[in-house]
Every structure is written in structure tokens, then in C-alpha cells.
Amino acid sequence: MKVLTDLQKRIFAIVKKENGKPIPPGIVVRMMENQAGFPGKQQVYRAIDDLLEWHIFRKSGGATNQLLINYELADPVLDQKFQGILNLGNKNTGFVRPLDDDKTVYYIHFSNLAGALDGDLVEFCPLDKPQVGDKFDAAVLKIVKRSRVLYAGNFLIEYSDFGQEFRIVADNPRFYLTPIVNKASVPAELESNTKVAFQIDEYDPANNLCKVSIQQILGNNDEPLINLKAIMLDHSIVFEDNDVVEQQAAKLQFDEKEQSKPYRKDLTELAFVTIDPATSKDLDDAIYVKRTDKGFVLYVAIADVAYYVQRNSELDIEARHKTSSIYLPGYYVVPMLPERLSNELCSLNPNEKRYVVVCELNFDHEARLNFSEVYPATIVSQRRFAYSEVNDWLEDSDALKDESATVLESLKAGFTLSELIAEQRKKKGTIDLSHSETEVVVDQNYYPIEIRFLTHGKAETMIENLMVVANEAVAWTLTNHKVHLPYRVHPRPSKKKLQMLLENIVELKITQPNFVLDTVTSTQIAAWLKENKDNPSYDIFVILLLRTLGKAFYIVNPLIHFSIGSHHYTHFTSPIRRYADLTVHRLLWMNLFTPERFTDTEREQLNAELEQICETINDTEIKINGCERTANDYLTTLYLSKQVGQTFHGFISAITSFGIFMRMDENNFDGLIKITSIPEDFFVFEKDRMVLRGKRTNKVFRIGDRLTAKLTEIDTVQKRAILTLV
């Protein structure tokens, strides 16, 4: 419990007299000016800031950010019980939406969490209090289901006058409970500063305590690889070694008899090549392009994973559980399939026969699609290219002077076709959201040694364009055969989100759009981006637009993929690393290629499972994306820890009530400038304009503003770089 100063008690008394009504901070200051012993505006604002930091006050959330007492005793409305997933913020106050009503938001103060943690399924009820803004106050009644069984933390041994004590510091900053370690669960050989996985045995919500037992020893807390594994565990990505799956994969062989089957075409004479990152080992796709009198023929050959991974086998069950391969920074990969498949039998390695599913597309001279077909085939990849090799060749034709003429002609035709496809897709409304990206380079022990800006060359663009048209063609093929499938969709952004975007870019001098928010099309968004291509704030504009557009996901209904400008889109081209693609391949086999080999019951069973498959993939994708972001933040801050004291340049990428995020030019990472560290004034967050404004000087910080700041601290708990203005 915080002990309030006399000044803070006086401020608290003023707010309390409002009986739950919001009061602006400026009015509090004005009322105190009439009291004896007024310490000055700056001191009052600093005291208010402390009360907000301690959760004693909260802001109303409206445009004026008025003050409310954060937690008051109120009766629970027990005849209105709901269930929902709890989302905790950095200050461990929560928000929850009922499972059957995602529009109503309930605010749960730290005191009303009842021991629930971020991601838990909880039962909650509203409190008998007035609604504030667009949120209701609520309290957790019970934890229905924990979001995970295991949590990661650093095990410490400490010594005091009372002897040896065990302590665990949880990795997740939102794990607010204090762990009390069950000594019986501590192995005798366990050393201090060891990363462990622990489970909650009991919890005491009144005192924010929990009794825990150690379940796994992960390794030395200072080793990056151990921390990457702990990050996966903390995002509920826990995959045990499965001997049955590995044994099943080890028995699989390339069967020469399969290539003579009547349903499988022999394309081994065509000059297929693969083009991938230099470090890739799982080569899903190969291409061959030829020019004809009528235009172009594109062959997109994709690894025939469904041939090897039979439905409901141990391999399939494990892949469905994982839903995709995981690629963490530093090339740490957790494959969806055993390496026997992902890197060998299914991977389209050069000079080896491989079974594939081919999408053959015939275009006219302007890359308008005339027709397409999908079928099983056998190919031999003639060359394994890295993107960098092909990009070098585009700059210098002698770079591949020893390659066969057939391969080079295919590459030339592929680039021409890709550029024409890009023009056609612009007409359909494909949105170019490319912006600067980085990767963390690590040494053999996963210690970060460099932050490198990624180059996106013409080779990468070509493969993207060719894969997109193949994905779309397969979606249309299955749809035309009345086969249900997992569509990849990206809904149109809501009017509310677009309105927020327009408010956020007011200060960026971005050209205002001339479209109607309710009916905006991707073509209009693409044109808006093009209009502002030369704006100095273009990069931050793209970042804000990405946040507005939201996330793509899988669903059985054919909704629009807004950013691609497609009404029927799926994922077909990466079955080695995505279960959605493997499912699409399986649907092709069961309904188009060899329907006679499957029963109607099998088709009906898979059809009935599609919705659950999509839901599982969507949920896991969120976890994996969060895991990848956390891993990147960890390695980046570990790298920056050696640069404390150095000066960086950048622009404001986000503004919050607690500070400014500056994206550093040198590494593309967002560092935090705390609002309390900004000198010369007390700054207030104006949410309606997304600016910080000084109360005395009226100085304003806006998104997109250029700044210079010094790196003063690395917050290893939040995985943040802390900056101060210079």
C-alpha cells in the first residue's frame, strides 16, 4: 500500500468529493490554488502523475482525460455474470469482453482481478457504478481456466539472517503475483540465476501471492538461446519431443512407383528452380515460366506434403497442434513437420525427384489470366537460388553466366510476368505496405552481433507476385467445385478505425483522402498511399495504416482479402510450414485429384472440422506473432545494452499517456521517452489529437516529429530501451 503525502491526500479528497464524476486535472489545480499552502502547479501535476502511476487515479479515457478514483467499493451485480478472456495492460489493470459480445468493454481494476492473469478465461460481473466513457467497471468472480500451465522465470537463491531463501522472478511483466517456491520441488543441483518453468499450485488473491512448483530446468538465465526457449514457453508454445512422430517420419521413403500413377504428370524435363532466403532449408515452392505466342505459362510447383502426411496420422495430429513452423530471430526454427520431411522428402532440393502439386496458369501478353488448372506432378528442381544471387544477376548479367540458357530464359520471363501481374493487381486494389524492416544477426551462441536492415529486391517481389496469383487461382478452383476451404481474409477497416487514423495523421501533413469511410475500397487506399509517397512522414504513415488495417485470418466463408484486393484467397504455397496450406492440399486430393480414393464420410468429416481448424490456427498465429515480437525485442535490447550512453536519431512513432516512443534510425527499434523525463514542463496527453502538450510552455510533441535522444537504460523486464531527450 502506498503512503500518500499530505499534498496527495488533499488531491485525493478533491477528486473523491465528485462522487464518481470525472474531474479535469486543471480544475483540481485551480481548486488547490485557493487553499493555504499551495505548492505550485508543477508540484500538483507531479503528484497527480504519481497517483495515476500507482493506480489510485485513472483517466476517463475521453478527449479531456479527466480524473477518477480508480477503485471504489461497489456492490457486484451478481445477476449479470459473463465469461471472457482477460487482457492485462503494462500496469496490470485489465479489460475484458464477454465471449458473446465483443463490442462491450469492461474495465477491471488491479484490486478486482482475484488472482487472474493475462489471457485467463474468467467469470466476471459488472460493479454497481456509473458507466465511464465507453467502459463499465467489473470484477473477476473466478478463474474458469488458466491460459497456460507453465510460466517461465529466473530462479534465485538468496541468503539472509533467516537462512537460504528461494525466489522466482517471472519473465512476463504482467505476472503480478509473487511466487512462493515449494522447496520440495527444487532439485538439489539447481543453481541460482537459472531459467525455470514453474506451475501455479495455489494462489492467494487477497495478498497477490501464489505457491508454485518447479517443473523444468531450462538453463542458464544469461544465455540467449535459453531465453528464446523461455519466451516460447511464456507464449504457450510448448512442444515436447514426440518420438512416435519422429519414428513415423523416419519410415517414409520416396516411392518411385508413385510417379507413374495416371493422375500425376511428369514435368521432370521442365527447368524448375527454387528461390529462397540463403538460410532456408524447407523449400516449399519452385517455379518455371515460359513465353508463348499467346503470352505466358506459369508453373508453380508446391511440395506434395499431403502425399506423405496422411490425415489423422500422428504426423498430421502433431502438425495440426503446431499449426505452423516458428521462425524466431537468429534463425532459430521450430518446424511444423519433422526434418525428415521438412528438409528432405518434401523440400524441393535441387537435382532430386520430388512429388508436387502444380498450379499451371496461362496469361495473355498483359498478364490477364486466361485459365488455370491444378494437378499432381513430379519435378526435378534444376537449381537452388538464394534471393541475393538472383538480385545480383539483375544488376550484372554475368553473375549467372554459367547457368543454362533454359533456366535464364525462365527467370527473364518470370520477371517480365511479375511486373505485368503487379500492374494488373494494382487495378484490383493491391495495397503496397512495404516499409523498412530489420533482422537481428546472432553468433553461434545466439548473442546478437548486428541489427541489419533487410533489402527487398526484385527477386523477392517476383516470388511474392507469382505465389499470390497461384493462391488466388487455387481458391477459385475449389470454390467453383463447391468445396469449402480455409479462406485467408482481411476485412475492410472499420469506419471508427479509419476515423482514428485521420485524426492521428493531422499533424503529418498527409493529403486527406477523398473517399467515403464506410465504403472505402483497397484501390482508394492504394491511390492515397501513392499520393503521399514523397511525404517525409511516409514511413510513419504506412506504420499507422498497418495498425488500422488489422490482422488477416482464416475463415470458411469467402470474405474479401482487403490489402490484396481479392474476393477469393487462400494459402496453398507453403504446406511444409503452414497447416492451412496442407489442409488446402488435402481438399484438392479428396475432391479433385482422386475423389474415388476417399469416402463421402471422410469428406464430410474434414468439412465439419474446417471451422475448428481455422479457429485453432488463428489462435495459435496470435501466440506465434507475439512470441516472435517478444524474441525480437529481447535480442534487440540485449544488443543495445552495450550502447547505453550513445545518442540516437529518429521520429516519434507513437504517443501514449506515459510517454513517447521514438523509432531510432540506426536500428528501427522503438525506444521509450518517459513523460516524466521530459524537461522544462509538465506534459499532458491529448488523446483526441494524439499529442503531448506542455501545460506552461504549450510545447507540442506530434507523431512524426524528428528527435535526438540518448539511450540511458535497458529495461530487461519490459524488454524496452529507455531514452532521454538531448
Curated annotation (Swiss-Prot):
UniProt-annotated location(s): Cytoplasm
UniProt keyword annotations, A-Z: Cytoplasm, Exonuclease, Hydrolase, Nuclease, RNA-binding
Catalytic activity, reaction form: Exonucleolytic cleavage in the 3'- to 5'-direction to yield nucleoside 5'-phosphates
Domain (S1 motif): residue spans on this chain: 645-726
Function of the protein: 3'-5' exoribonuclease that releases 5'-nucleoside monophosphates and is involved in maturation of structured RNAs.
Keyword Transcription (UniProt): no
Organism this protein belongs to: Mycoplasma pneumoniae (strain ATCC 29342 / M129 / Subtype 1) (Mycoplasmoides pneumoniae)
EC number: 3.1.13.1
GO cellular component terms listed in the entry, alphabetical order: cytosol
Xref: CDD domains: S1_RNase_R (cd04471)
PANTHER family: DIS3-LIKE EXONUCLEASE 2, RIBONUCLEASE
The RNB domain, residue ranges: 264-592
Domain of life of the native organism: Bacteria
Family: Belongs to the RNR ribonuclease family. RNase R subfamily.
Gene label: rnr
GO BP of this protein: mRNA catabolic process
GO molecular function list: exoribonuclease II activity; RNA binding
EC category name: hydrolase
Protein's recorded name: Ribonuclease R
